Amino acid sequence: MGILGIIVEYNPFHNGHLYHLQTSKELTKCDYTIAVMSGNFVQRGEPAIVDKWKRTQMALKAGIDLVIELPVVYATSTAENFAYGAVKLLDSLKIVDCISFGSEKGDLNELTKIAEILLEEPIYYRKALKEYLKSGITFAKARELALQKVINNNEIEKILQTSNNILAIEYLKSLKKIGSSITPFTIKRKGSLYTSLELKGEFASASSIRKHIFEKGLEGLEKYIPDFTKEILQSSFEKKQGPVSLEEFSNILIYLLRNHIPLNHIFDVSEGLENKIYKASYKTNNVEELMKLVKSKRYTESRIRHILIHLLLNIDKQIFKEFDGPNYIRVLGFNEKGKEMLREIKKKSPLPIITKVSQYKEKLSNTKMFEKDLFATDIYTLAYKNSSIAGLDFIHPLIKL
């Protein structure tokens, strides 16, 4: 039985995701599928539109057999940390044969070549990088030019400017870094770019679907999302459990910033940026507006988003030094095939499986990372329009299909 691993967010699940899942199963000829999925906060540096249990329902209805949560410290980090945490978790299961991910390039050889150079940093690459950095350009641009020089490929700029290619390269780097035996596959992305905000083409991006939901609701999305996604979203919204956006947390974030809560413990914060964020918090009450005030050529919106989410969730950069990947397997949901795989994982994986959250202290010698997930849920539910209690992780049942 071949087992396929995929790394997902399903924010929300749409027809492009369905295409990737079905094509991946056909390409790899795997009979079983495991998804490592971001929880209530996602890699863009924002809350998911609906919670992790609703998105687990979508995944299982689409044909995923087992859904495992990617710890929030990795789910909300840089592409490099996100990929490393997710790949390390899949590898730690000790049953996964293949991994499949989307990319705009769709060419594994080209992406692998780039991944190997970035991981190994051969002397000729380091020399070229140093030369370009001396000219005063940003690190990202210097890296791009250095790669272009050593690989002699004019498409490098195009490859490194699209988010799925960047993640694909990071997945390949992580597989190589940990010496994983998992075989990688890539599916060429179809339809709109990941960042596109327009509903168009055969497959719309998750960003454009979320934008439509916030502005116009669910009507008009039938062409882009499966019926089950629409039903799950509709049910959530009727219960006033979403749609959730970063703006819901504006007051908390502005309070923390005006109170000058230190930012220097957060990943990717420099002194100049810290002061700029503090100053901007006195000019607006809205977090989206704050990001526009801080954003510049030097400080990207993505970087600012991640800093704000880590401030909101109190994620310290030290945690990445304390852990080498996730130290537990948090199960969110499964079907009968997923139950079979859990039995195999229990036999083979060195990591504890957590299905009953109340037992986490007995199962984990270091609870710090897991408790960040619990805290993230408690913060996330503050955005619900109904009265929501804390501790949802302890009382929400596993999703079973």
From Swiss-Prot:
Predominant location category: cytoplasm
Pfam family, one: HIGH_NTase1
Top EC class, one word: ligase
Keywords: ATP-binding, Cytoplasm, Ligase, Nucleotide-binding, RNA-binding, tRNA processing, tRNA-binding
EC number(s) on file: 6.3.4.-
UniProt superkingdom: Bacteria
Any GO CC annotation of this UniProt entry: cytoplasm
Disulfide bond annotation, renumbered to this chain: none
Catalytic activity reported: cytidine(34) in elongator tRNA(Met) + acetate + ATP = N(4)-acetylcytidine(34) in elongator tRNA(Met) + AMP + diphosphate
Places the protein is found: Cytoplasm
GO molecular function per UniProt: ATP binding; ligase activity, forming carbon-nitrogen bonds; tRNA binding
Biological process (GO), any one: tRNA modification
UniProt binding sites for ATP: 7-20, 102, 164, 189
Job description of the protein: Catalyzes the formation of N(4)-acetylcytidine (ac(4)C) at the wobble position of elongator tRNA(Met), using acetate and ATP as substrates. First activates an acetate ion to form acetyladenylate (Ac-AMP) and then transfers the acetyl group to tRNA to form ac(4)C34.
Family recorded in the similarity comment: Belongs to the TmcAL family.
Stored PANTHER family: TRNA(MET) CYTIDINE ACETATE LIGASE
Protein name: tRNA(Met) cytidine acetate ligase
Species this protein is from: Thermoanaerobacter sp. (strain X514)
